[in-house]
Amino acid sequence: HPTYSPDMIEKKYVDAICRGEGEIYFLELIEKLENNEDFYATKNFWFKKEDGSIVKNPIGDLVNNLDEPPRPDRALMYDVDDSLRARGTKLFMATRGCPYKCTYCFNHAYNKLTKGHGDMMRYRSVDSVIEEIREVKDNYFLDRVNIDDDIFLLKPKGWLEEFAEKYPK
């Protein structure tokens, strides 16, 4: 993963990497490319120039409101991979982050990298998660929901109760 192994930019076949979250800055990069603007100063990105030099941009702000970014376009996976589409277990995320410093986990390094760029723990609303589950269920085979958070039980007060009430419906 380029966030933790940014030296992969030195590989012959790599021209750019995104470190950290990409939703905000990838869109910014695309807009700059579409408008023929200088894109080499896009936060979260490292670029390899034609002369081989590497531009290392700083980390930008984290996405604090996880309801804002568009949800993953699952058609990109499920419409091209029959085995993924047929698998009944689908993954969802309700939070990002973890406050703990377990030595075997990446989160302590990620928290150090992104310190000062936003809240360590970020959450989606229950309604947003339920809406995504419903959308997937309406379009794909779904018999098991896997909420793939780094730490599922660490939620704002009342979140789990609200989810437990709304999910069965």
Predicted features and spans:
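Glycine-rich beta-alpha loop elements in corrinoid/cobalamin-binding modules
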Residues: 1-62
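Radical SAM [4Fe-4S] cluster-binding motif and immediate context
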Residues: 67-169
